[in-house]
Amino acid sequence: MLLCGLGLGGYLAWELYGTDVVAGRAQDDLRERVVQAWADGEEAEPEVVLVRIPRFGPDWEKPVLTGLDDTVLARSIGRDPDNAGPGEVGNLVLAGHRVTHGSPFRRFLDLRAGDLVEVETRDAVHTYRLREDGRRTRVDFSASWPLQPVPEPGAGRERPSEALLTLITCSEIFHTDDRSVVTGVLVETHPKTS
């Protein structure tokens, strides 16, 4: 019984803290490699971009990988490859964990309407303004509208007319089938100088 309790405690400690340490270091390393590659005028890992959310702190910057599967989300924030890219008309969808695997969206519920989100590529910085608070929209994990080209309930496959952003994470700190969602709209694009 004691061994079972110790084993369970060790597993929970690993899930809650160990994966944060390992993934956090890997995210920092990847971010540094991306910044260096761009400074050298090269591409970093294919389709890696950086995201900054000032509400999460002045130094908060995370790499965004392509894909939304468990392997990608265990490494960092993921981007839906079936939707728009940064700065493009359509829906740029980013998802990440609130707990474990670096906890990139730990403070998601602190987001406020009007907050800015910067998405940096090798060539430009795209700034989106959030339309709602992080606590406002909670959906079942099976809801598909946040992944649609126009992220609104009932919009279906409506054609987008503007560059949009959707951020998605778990609604609760511990396991839940609900997701918290915020959307934003592109307000600025600044090309980077060589």
Give the role of each language-model region.
Residues 3-194:
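Solvent-exposed, non-transmembrane regions of membrane-associated and secreted proteins
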